[in-house]
Amino acid sequence: MPHNTKSMDNTLNIKDNHVQIGGRKSKLAVVQSEIVKECIVEKFPELSCSVLALSTLGDKVQSKPLYSFGGKALWTKELEILLLEQVEEYPRLDLIVHSLKDIPTNLPEEFELGCILNREDARDALVMKSGSSYKSLADLPDGSLVGTSSVRRSSQLLKNHPKLRFDSVRGNLQTRLNKLDDENSPFECLLLASAGLIRIGLGDRITAHLDAPEMYYAVGQGALGIEIRKGDEKMLQLLKTIEDLPTTYCCLAERSLMRHLEGGCSVPIGVQSHYNESTNELSLKAIIVSPDGIHFVEDEYKGVVNNKDDADAIGIKVGDLLSAKGGREILNSINFERINLPPSSNTPTPQPITPITTNNS
């Protein structure tokens, strides 16, 4: 449920007392749109809400790994068109529900991030093949094949488990699980977001949660973000009542870090954040790992956050710390055509990049 319990005057004067929600067509996306719908109706019972589910480019093209698209607006563009205007039989949208990790940190000027909802478990999940006796990545024999389409996950996997192999696996969650469980499947396990499995009732498939430092999660992972038209004051007022401030502060810091480093959602930046409501302190840890798992930089920073600008500043600070250690060099040197090559048998031990300067303040 949303953390913000502030009651507001319900005189929003929304046209026809109706909110048109848009989202992707996958089962998970529909569930997430329904979560937002329920939150709105709970706060404003006089409003009606409906959900329009559409396929996006990321849904339509399942044969290519995510990195090959460049990671920019892969899940958002088609829906954004309907935020601006009605198209044929499709109604104009008032808002779009996204997994926050899929929303680019730099949105087109016509749109803005309206709010961030309460975060589900942000960690990655290890899902073993049905009937497997293995309980952790460390249990797997050398050369075992792990399924993931995420550069962030595969790079950290190679850093911490260099004897394992990985390959891209696409499709919705159930499709990927079916591929894993097929008796002819080459995969021993999958790496997936815990939040998605939990939201569609498949939390029992989680063999283990992966915590830092073994696996830092993606920027915004586990949180829902709502995209709206820029300057839509009525929607902003409505969404203010369902946002979750601790989640918002953490995710804004994470997104500020990614924006500062100019990294799209398909680059190997991992994070871990926490907001202490008693002290108003936000801590942000982050890691950048080269796709082969050999080079990495990591750092952390903690500071007082009383507003969204403070949260942005934390992200910029961590970005500067990582840059000083060579983080930008890792991101700039990525060759996406080689990301999916398996590690060689003589993979070197992962090494942190020698810092250009040292700054822990």
UniProtKB/Swiss-Prot annotation:
Cross-referenced InterPro entries: HemC, Porphobilin_deaminase_cofac_BS, Porphobilin_deaminase_N, Porphobilinogen_deaminase_C, Porphobilinogen_deaminase_C_sf
GO molecular function: hydroxymethylbilane synthase activity
Start and end residues of each stretch annotated as Disordered: 341-361
Catalysed reaction equations from the record: 4 porphobilinogen + H2O = hydroxymethylbilane + 4 NH4(+)
Location of S-(dipyrrolylmethanemethyl)cysteine modifications: C265
Note on how the cofactor is bound: Binds 1 dipyrromethane group covalently.
PROSITE patterns: PORPHOBILINOGEN_DEAM (PS00533)
EC number(s) given by UniProt: 2.5.1.61
Protein family according to the UniProt entry: Belongs to the HMBS family.
NCBIfam families the record matches: hemC
Protein's name according to its UniProt entry: Porphobilinogen deaminase
Organism this protein belongs to: Debaryomyces hansenii (strain ATCC 36239 / CBS 767 / BCRC 21394 / JCM 1990 / NBRC 0083 / IGC 2968) (Yeast)
